[in-house]
Design a protein with these regions (language model features):
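Conserved, well-structured core segments that form the ligand-binding/active-site neighborhood
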Residues: 160
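Hydrophobic alpha-helical transmembrane segments of multi-pass integral membrane proteins
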Residues: 182-200
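A structural-propensity feature for long, helix-poor, extended segments
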Residues: 63-65
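Juxtamembrane transmembrane-helix boundary motif
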Residues: 1-24, 31-53, 58, 67-157, ...
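Transmembrane-embedded, aromatic-rich helix segments that form part
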Residues: 165
Length: 269
């Protein structure tokens, strides 16, 4: 049963997810997935065998709107390296589609442990201002395609837009913080779109999904969350471009660490 409390909570989370997406070039999935699961619980359907798939698919659908809003705002700031986006997008879409098809077969716990470890390492390197070698640049197309496929698949399995992976990678390749975040927003939109299509198709014929679902997309939550994210993503972008690069980089490292702590807490509780 939908109540004003649920709707207002979704709007609040959508606002926060949109702002964070714009600020850090991510998709906001780390906030959206838990709140969708909470919404399903209030509807009495959290025990559905595909509840997690519904949450991830819904997260991707919301990110389609969030990341487009963020990407457009970053483009107006001339902060996106479109050549890098064009080179990485095909492999990332391929990885997302692989992830969507194989999600139900993945050892979720092992994947989450690996992801938590990776985020913690990257966060600590970012916070300690570990600088890459000046000679380090993006790899050639074969290497970039391998990275893109891996990032796309991981994004699909965990339900994120990929910014938690692509921003550190781009900064590791000597992209300035603002440029890395802007370019990541350009990469996040095709990931979100591919993930949405993947979860829509793979869940289309699954029986007994909640009323209002389209495949593994819970459409009422998509509509409410997207309204807020579209509004607040450009605000996050404007805020990011007002911050010094060092402060933005530290803030991003703190965000990664908080995501890792949250995921670890969910594993052990």
């Amino acid at each position: 049963m939908w109540t004003w409390d649920i709707i207002l909570a979704l709007l609040a989370v959508g606002s926060a997810a949109g702002f964070i997406a714009g600020l850090f070039g991510v998709g906001g999935g780390t906030l959206v997935v838990p709140v969708v699961l909470w919404t399903l619980q209030l509807q009495g359907i959290s025990s559905h065998p595909y509840a997690q798939h519904l949450a991830i698919g819904t997260s991707f659908a919301v990110m389609v709107f969030t990341t487009f809003s963020s990407m457009y705002a970053q483009h107006k700031k001339s902060a996106i390296d479109w050549q890098t986006v064009r080179r990485m997008t095909p492999s990332m879409i391929f990885g997302v589609l692989i992830g969507a098809v194989t999600a139900k077969y993945m050892p979720t716990r092992a994947l989450q442990i690996f992801f938590i470890s990776f985020l913690t390492l990257v966060a600590l390197k970012t916070l300690t201002d570990s600088k890459p070698k000046a000679s380090r640049h993006l790899p050639a197309l074969p290497g970039l395609s391998a990275v893109g496929t891996l990032f796309g698949a991981a994004s699909s399995w965990v339900g994120i837009g990929g910014g938690s992976l692509s921003v550190p990678f781009l900064m590791y390749c000597n992209f300035p913080a603002h440029r890395a975040i802007g370019t990541s927003s350009g990469l996040a939109w095709p990931i979100a779109l591919a993930g949405t299509i993947g979860y829509l198709v793979t869940g289309w014929n699954v029986p007994d999904l909640p009323h209002g679902s389209g495949g593994f997309l819970y459409l009422p939550a998509v509509a409410i969350l997207s309204i807020a994210t579209i509004i607040f993503a450009p605000i996050g972008v404007k805020t990011a471009h007002k911050l010094p690069a060092r402060q933005l980089k530290i803030s991003f490292g703190i965000m990664l660490l908080l995501i890792a702590i949250k995921m670890a807490w969910n594993l052990v509780r």
